[in-house]
């Protein structure tokens, strides 16, 4: 079994880690950073950019730069109305699925495809670091992700060419990293406020056992929302002063968003931040600028509602775990947004404890995923992880009521069977609506789809006995089977109508990704060979000038001819010729260098010979004076 990497696929930033020598190691990306922005962009030349390089050009290319795609993964259009208004690219409807429009390619992407490009970069960078291809991974998701979002994350991994061995909850991964070497039993509360989601989990940790007692959260709350309140404040202030709504200009909106994120980060350490955006827009009177000072107090006032929303999941998780705040030993803070002083203060106020800040909030989730990868690969022993399902699962029954089969915070994997019957005489099929959520009425919960069992022998209502089994695997993903006890007929049911991609769509995306990966590599190879050729042309010209008359003209002429040919090939973008000429010119330069050394050695030997003769003539001199040496004291 090859190396299994752990990947924290974040809303704003992602991170990859691996077990090395029994210890988890965070892997820096190709640019040298330990976290990678979860951003994918396509340039006007149709080149794909991923990570920091994609984020840098977002202001100039807002409609073709995709970020916060995690907020759309595994969700239907009617579930992302608010989120779709907060991004600079177009979010479109395709049936009930979400699609992200890329004008420069005249194409639509699923959010899973965008997430896959981030996963591909992380796995490729990890592969370069480890010196082997990476094709297996453990990927983390927010604890409060529903079945569709978990399946969609797995699909993203498949599109990226990865076998996803396990989907693990982010707070659980953080607890693994925190508690790996701890022997004493502790009850910990993981407070995970990331870029787009918020989770709280309560766990019992000790001696290699990690048992999740409860989990709660809000998949609509994260750092992006804190950025938004600053953006709204900047836009409202500018509109009041200038009468222009900057939110209608996608390029201006992108600049505001970047400035808001920067100010938010600065305000974690400073009491105020200067926001200066020159030439944000223009009117007939001339250019307009944003110039504003944002204090920490003002920011906390703007974000007070968001901070208050963090309170409820903490209280709910403690209630579900049947624990008081006094029974919690440690509060582990996870996610970049937990650096905000107001968030730390809220946690201290609610729990009565100072948060434990010994873990790196940006990396701890990936580290935990790597540990789980080590467990699955057999590298890490004596670790037992007992996770839970975050939301209840059930079916719609008579009157539009949700009847729960598996309640939230049930340890997974788990299996539950219930017996149902028909509602009318002579009924030969049953349609069952599968739901996920905590509300009493079916219409208020998340619909995972419907399934239908045919071939039931006609009988009076209430007589047929149909066993329905819900099975949740270790990834928290649901499968359903049904059996008619009367006929003995058993059928495996695949849920349809959910917001995840079909198998055919996933396979097509896998092939597209592989094709694009090949095309991208070819494009990169062409760029590399051209850069190499241009560098060689310059170095050759410089070297010939420095050598001057130290080499014979015939050797210089051969090198110069190759240099001119290579320069012409680079100007014509003739890559095959470039490859050949680069090798030829390098050989000529090696020969030229060798001849220079030979001439230099010959000259040195000649000089040594002259010196030797001079020494011999000195030895033959008889006019030698003898003298005594006396030390002077």
UniProtKB/Swiss-Prot annotation:
Modified positions (Phosphothreonine) in chain numbering: 197
| SUPFAM superfamilies linked | Actin-like ATPase domain, Heat shock protein 70kD (HSP70), C-terminal subdomain, Heat shock protein 70kD (HSP70), peptide-binding domain
Q: Please note every region of biased composition (Acidic residues).
A: 620-633
**Where are the stretches annotated Disordered?**
600-633
Xref: PROSITE patterns: HSP70_1, HSP70_2, HSP70_3
Keyword tags: ATP-binding, Chaperone, Nucleotide-binding, Phosphoprotein, Stress response
Biased region (Low complexity) positions are 608-619
Write down the superkingdom of origin. Answer: Bacteria
Q: What induces it?
A: By stress conditions e.g. heat shock.
Among the GO molecular function terms of this UniProt record, one is: ATP binding
Family to which the UniProt record says this protein belongs: Belongs to the heat shock protein 70 family.
Record's NCBIfam families? PRK00290.1, PRK05183.1, prok_dnaK
Tell me, in a sentence or two, what this protein's role is: Acts as a chaperone.
Question: What's the protein called, per UniProt?
Answer: Chaperone protein dnaK2
Gene source species? Prochlorococcus marinus (strain SARG / CCMP1375 / SS120)
Source organism lineage?
Answer: Bacteria, Bacillati, Cyanobacteriota, Cyanophyceae, Synechococcales
């Amino acid at each position: 079994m090859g190396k299994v990497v752990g990947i924290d696929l974040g809303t704003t930033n992602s991170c990859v880690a691996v077990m090395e020598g029994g210890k988890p190691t965070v892997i820096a990306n190709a640019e040298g950073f330990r976290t990678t922005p979860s951003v994918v962009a396509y340039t006007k030349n149709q080149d794909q950019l991923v990570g920091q390089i994609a984020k840098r050009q977002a202001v100039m290319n807002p409609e073709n730069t995709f970020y916060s795609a995690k907020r759309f993964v595994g969700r239907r259009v009617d579930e992302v109305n608010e989120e779709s208004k907060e991004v600079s690219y177009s979010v479109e409807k395709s049936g009930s699925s979400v699609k992200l429009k890329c004008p420069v390619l005249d194409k639509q992407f699923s959010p899973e495809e965008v997430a896959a490009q981030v996963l591909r970069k992380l796995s490729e960078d990890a592969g370069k670091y480890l010196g082997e291809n990476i094709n297996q991974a453990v990927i983390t998701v927010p604890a409060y992700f529903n079945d569709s979002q978990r399946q969609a994350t797995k699909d993203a991994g498949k599109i990226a060419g990865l076998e996803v061995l396990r989907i693990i909850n982010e707070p659980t991964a953080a607890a693994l990293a925190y508690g790996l070497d701890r022997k004493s039993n502790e009850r910990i509360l993981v407070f995970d406020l990331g870029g787009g989601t918020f989770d709280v989990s309560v766990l019992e940790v000790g001696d290699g056992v990690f048992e999740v007692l409860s989990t709660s959260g809000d998949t609509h709350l994260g750092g992006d929302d804190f950025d938004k309140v600053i953006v709204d404040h900047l836009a409202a202030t500018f509109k009041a002063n200038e009468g222009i709504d900057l939110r209608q200009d996608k390029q201006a909106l992108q600049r505001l968003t970047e400035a808001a994120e920067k100010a938010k980060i600065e305000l974690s350490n400073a009491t105020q931040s200067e926001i200066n955006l020159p030439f944000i827009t223009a009117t007939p009177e001339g250019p307009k600028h944003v110039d504003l000072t944002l204090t920490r107090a003002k920011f906390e006032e703007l974000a007070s509602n968001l901070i208050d929303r963090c309170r409820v999941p903490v209280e709910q998780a403690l209630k579900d775990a049947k624990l008081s705040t006094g029974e919690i030993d440690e509060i582990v803070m996870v996610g970049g947004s937990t650096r905000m002083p107001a968030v730390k203060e809220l946690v201290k106020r609610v729990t009565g404890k100072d948060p434990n800040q010994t873990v790196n909030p940006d990396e701890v989730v990936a580290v935990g995923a790597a540990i789980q990868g080590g467990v699955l690969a057999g590298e890490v022993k004596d670790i037992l992880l007992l996770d839970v399902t975050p939301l209840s699962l059930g079916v719609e029954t008579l009157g539009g009521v949700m009847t729960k089969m598996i309640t939230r915070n049930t340890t997974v994997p788990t299996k539950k069977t219930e017996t149902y019957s028909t509602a009318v005489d002579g009924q030969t099929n049953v349609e069952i609506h599968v739901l996920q959520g905590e509300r009493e009425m079916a219409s208020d919960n998340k619909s995972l789809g419907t399934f239908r069992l045919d071939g039931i022998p006609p009988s009076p209502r209430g007589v047929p006995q149909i066993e329905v089994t819900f099975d949740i695997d270790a990834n928290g993903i649901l499968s359903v089977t049904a059996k008619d006890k009367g006929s003995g007929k058993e059928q495996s049911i695949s849920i349809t109508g959910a917001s995840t991609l079909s198998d055919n769509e996933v396979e097509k995306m896998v092939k597209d990704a592989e094709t694009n990966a090949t095309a991208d590599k070819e494009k990169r190879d062409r760029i590399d060979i051209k850069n190499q050729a241009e560098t060689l042309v310059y170095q050759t010209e410089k070297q010939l000038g420095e050598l001057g008359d130290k080499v014979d003209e015939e050797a210089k002429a051969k090198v110069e001819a190759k240099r001119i040919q290579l320069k012409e090939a680079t100007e014509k973008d003739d890559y095959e010729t470039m490859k050949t000429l680069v090798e030829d010119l390098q050989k000529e330069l090696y020969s030229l260098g060798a001849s220079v050394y030979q001439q230099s050695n010959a000259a040195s030997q000649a000089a040594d010979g002259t010196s030797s003769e001079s020494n011999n003539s000195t030895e033959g001199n008889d006019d030698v004076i003898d003298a005594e040496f006396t030390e002077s004291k």
